[in-house]
């Protein structure tokens, strides 16, 4: 196997063991600062924001990839081992399994203290308004976020790291960060964020569908309803404005026999969304743990798939 696959294995294990340590200043924060600074600069300059959007997207992704390439080149000058360590660390910081699971567990724990505490905690990981959410709505929001993050935070990074090492992984992370900061359809971001949103859709197109397949298989392996997960994916995979989000959400909804999606408030305004899955039963706190199990199992399946392909090659 190539060194970058070994580095990916090491990075994957580090994420499982350590997550994102609180003392580590995450590279995504640096990317976010650049995006915020450049967005303000482009807005002040005026002109056609749709053209500026392309520059914002391209400069963020290419600059990120260039910095990672420079780091790897410098480490490579020191020898194979320093390069392997650098790649492993960059892969580790680009994967978000344990940190997402930890946030989800935090919501479940907060709900034990009451709905108000649950609302405060879930606000850390969702974009919708949370001040009026019921306990069941908090649980559903958490399950949705975990299932979406299985694509954005795990399967996509692993796929791009396997194809192009840390350079391609961090190109994807830059695009994902752009989408989370400016890739909205509201009046403020419609022009400056359109290219970031489209790039994120393109980059997640294959990983989203792969994630759904992995989640269906994982459902069988961990005792959830894989057959129903597959049925709901086939039926509801298009029930979202995004071409990608409903794939993993429908797999989770089917595996858990709960209904996700529906209308929610964002910035005080209701946003109508189709439902995903069937309301076979009310969502319960244990569904957060089940969603985390799906996250871990799907991630492990993806890593095994990458290693097997690397061995065969």
Stretches with model-predicted labels:
Residues 180:
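Glycine-rich phosphate/dinucleotide-binding loop and adjoining beta-alpha-beta core of small-molecule
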Residues 1-175, 183-313:
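Hydrophobic alpha-helical transmembrane segments
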